[in-house]
A protein has these predicted regions:
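Non-transmembrane, aqueous-exposed alpha-helical and coiled segments at domain scale
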Residues: 1-448
Length: 448
């Protein structure tokens, strides 16, 4: 172990030699974060899988519009509303759509659900060897390690045939919820001192039902609870090729590596607080607001505290209202709109109704306060994180699983993008970095 003094000295040297003058980025016209100056993403590829539409550009000017999320040509609003109209679970249909490119008929969907049920169980001794014997405080870390470990249980993991890739994708999508719940139960036992319980899987369960059944000691849940969790899985399943985790998956895929490595990297990306981990920031901020606003129905008091947050005087002092704003969406995030409507219905006449109204007030008040305090006319809307954590809390799902739930859902999108990259990519993704270091003459060791 490095002592504190040595560590501090090394860190000073590390920081000094790894800092680049910000002016150089402008001089060499570097698109930092692969973003254009107006915040839009640099065009790095083409995709048939998903369209995330939040603005239009007219004569070089970015104009805000109502957001649209389209999976394989189908609007997310239509996919959700039809599943609800027919009173059935929709996530498995979304998975099929993303992987295969079109909607299944009844027979195809039934067969596909059967494939997912068959693939949910973990390999023999996997739970004991890979999860129970090596617990992790962070479930995302454990999920990434578990996906990598599945490579060793595969008879032919370097096979790149379409048949193998499809079978592996269905296997991983099906197993990941089981891995998540298993890792969480072990974490509770090893780090929280709670009892460990593992329920046998029920083959007829949907993905949402399987998760709720596995998490609860008595296995009991209502249809309303399972349907709103299914809705969350649908909304998080895919979001274009440019988001960090999907791009990471495509970057690794372009190198020719195996699917386990590519999907594990995507989980590692989603774990980051600037990406999937942002939902934990939203939950923490909401708790801070609840603790500091005495009257949740007083919009003036709510606005005063939001002003403190925006002025970097409260919460984490970053000046950010988490859950508000998005890199693409401007006037609305369709996922947030759908989730807000369903969260409202679920919260009505329950202990959660007051909290829902508080979140609604935060969403309504923040854009004008942001404009007033920051002096910006930038369009701002609530993103899906504004209400996802709230719905998870109504379901009794712990914060430890907020981002892992995101990963469970998004695995379908990652798999679809890997397929597309394998079929159409044909070259390794390799952007350029300009060296700005100064040439130095080597100094012999004794003369330094």
């Amino acid at each position: 172990m490095i002592n504190n003094a040595a560590r501090s000295l090394l860190c000073e040297q590390f920081i000094a030699n790894n800092t680049i003058d910000p002016k150089l980025y402008d001089r060499y016209v570097v698109k930092r974060g692969l973003r254009n100056s107006d915040g839009t993403g640099v065009m790095a590829g083409l995709t048939n899988i998903c369209n995330v539409h939040g603005y239009v550009v007219n004569e070089g000017e970015k104009s805000p519009i109502q957001g649209q999320l389209i999976f394989r040509g189908y609007n997310i609003n239509d996919l959700v509303s039809n599943a609800q109209k027919e009173n059935r679970f929709g996530y498995e249909e979304i998975v099929y759509l993303l992987l295969m490119g079109d909607l299944p008929n009844r027979e195809e969907l039934t067969a596909f659900k059967g494939m997912m049920a068959e693939n949910r169980p973990l390999p023999d001794n996997f739970f004991e060897d890979m999860i129970l014997k090596a617990p992790s405080k962070n479930i995302m870390n454990k999920m990434a390690r578990a996906i990598l470990a599945l490579y060793s249980y595969d008879d032919n993991p370097e096979n790149r045939s379409p048949e193998y890739e499809m079978a592996t994708a269905i296997s991983i999508i099906s197993k990941l919820p089981n891995i998540m719940v298993s890792a969480y139960q072990v974490k509770k036992r090893c780090y929280d001192g709670e009892s460990l319980f593992m329920h046998p899987l029920i083959p007829t369960h949907s993905t949402a039902e399987m998760i709720l059944s596995a998490l609860r000691p008595d296995r009991q849940f209502t249809e309303e609870e399972a349907k709103i969790l299914d809705l969350l899985l649908m909304l998080h399943a895919e979001h274009g090729g440019g988001n960090n985790s999907t791009f990471a998956c495509r970057v690794l895929t372009s190198s020719g590596t195996d699917p386990y490595s590519a999907y594990s990297a995507a989980i590692g990306s989603l774990k980051g607080p600037r990406h999937g981990g942002a939902n934990l920031k939203v939950a923490a901020m909401h708790q801070c607001i609840k603790d500091n606003v005495q009257n949740w129905e007083d919009e003036g008091e709510i606005a005063d505290f939001l002003t403190k947050i925006l002025n970097k005087e409260a919460f984490d002092h970053t000046g950010l209202v988490y859950g508000m704003g998005h890199a693409v969406y401007t006037l609305s995030d369709p996922r947030a709109v759908i989730l807000r409507e369903n969260a409202k219905k679920m919260a009505e006449n329950t202990e959660f109704e007051r909290e829902y109204k508080l979140l609604e007030a935060v969403e309504r008040l923040t854009p004008e306060l942001f404009k007033k305090i920051k002096g910006s006319d930038k369009a701002m809307c609530a993103n899906v994180d504004m209400y996802s954590g709230f719905v998870y809390s109504m379901l009794g799902i712990p914060e430890d699983l907020y981002t892992p739930m995101f990963a469970v859902s998004r695995m379908a999108g990652w798999c679809a993008h890997r397929f597309e990259e394998l079929v159409t990519g044909k070259r390794i993704i390799r952007p350029a970095y300009k060296a700005v270091s100064v040439e130095k003459k080597y100094i012999p060791l004794d003369e330094r």
